[in-house]
């Protein structure tokens, strides 16, 4: 990514010099397994890999209007699921059809963190991750497994 992140993109707290997700966030998101907050893909607005994402979206059935993709943690990297593979996370990139769309991932993440941290509402572990061009995306651990 080129830029170190010292605020955890999941729990929104300083990481104590570490870059990426804090140990507490990793425990919640992936049972303590180390995962990178950088996706191994370029943002697909430039049509690079669009078929890969389109094929992946056919394998996930989550209601709602925003496009969603299925991810697994593979050797520390969040990647799209392959056919027949059970996803661990749901990825929601920036939508193309909304005003102020660049704020959608942060808005959804902040809303979930306020629910969990301020009001004590049980919420699925979530965070921000980033495409290789630093475009943010929202992801959440699946709770229906």
What are the residue ranges of the model-derived segments?
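Regulatory N- and C-terminal appendages and interdomain linkers associated
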Residues: 1-47
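Conserved ATP-binding subdomain of kinase catalytic cores across diverse folds
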Residues: 47-145
């Amino acid at each position: 990514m080129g830029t170190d992140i010292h605020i955890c993109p999941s729990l929104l707290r300083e990481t104590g010099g570490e870059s990426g997700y804090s140990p507490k966030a990793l425990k919640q998101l992936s049972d303590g397994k180390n995962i990178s907050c950088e996706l191994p893909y370029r943002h697909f607005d430039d049509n690079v890999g669009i078929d890969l994402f389109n094929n992946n979206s056919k394998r996930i059935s989550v209601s709602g209007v925003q496009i969603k993709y299925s991810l697994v943690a593979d050797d520390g990297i969040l990647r799209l699921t392959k056919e027949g593979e059970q996803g661990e996370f749901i990825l929601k990139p920036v939508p193309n059809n909304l005003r102020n769309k660049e704020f959608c991932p942060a808005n959804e993440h902040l809303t979930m963190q306020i629910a969990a941290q301020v009001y004590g509402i049980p919420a699925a572990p979530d965070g921000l991750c980033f495409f290789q061009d630093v475009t943010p995306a929202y992801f959440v651990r699946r709770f229906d497994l």
